[in-house]
Amino acid sequence: PEGTGSLVIGVQTPGCHPAHSSYFFKRVQVTQGDDIYEFFKQHNPHMCEKSVWNTHGTDDVITFPIKAKEGSVVKDDLSAIQHLNIVRMLQKQWVIPGTTSQNKKNITNNVSCTIIVKKEEWHQVISHIYEHRHTYAAVSLLDYYGDKIYAQAPFEKITSASEFNKYCSLLDNYKEVDYSKLYEVKDKTTHNAEVACGNGSCLVA
């Protein structure tokens, strides 16, 4: 259920999140000049655009067209309370039992998750989280239509013909990227940060 780990092994959505929809856009914010991003952009410039969230103009965003795998649970299959109960279960059955016995401060990791909340669910969700407040540590709440309210949302459900046409265009023009051909011509390592974050601690805020 760990977010990055689940993606690495091929799970379509991170952690304990259901698929956003049967068809959706997934967006990733990236830094301009990053070698991996620039290599990707050479092959798929049509998937890249300026980020509207970076005031310095140094970030871009990549939009990936995604179709959920057959039989996937999507966000509309779960109520907000059902999703919250999954988070609670993982916290109790996975995070807490996996805490190292050497931890003397009673500090644990947590299950981070974004819960999609319909208009009629808000009061119940607030009461539920307060009742179980010692269980939740990193839960975000998003309005059901939040993916349409916020520009370049990380996940956006495809709901219109124009959006589906964009999905098809992104997919049809996608070019496979062979990352084995990527190599750095300049070392961009920030040595101060590398030293500061060595030996199991990090001084960089």
Region locations from a protein language model:
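Short acidic, low-complexity intrinsically disordered linear motifs used
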Residues: 188-205
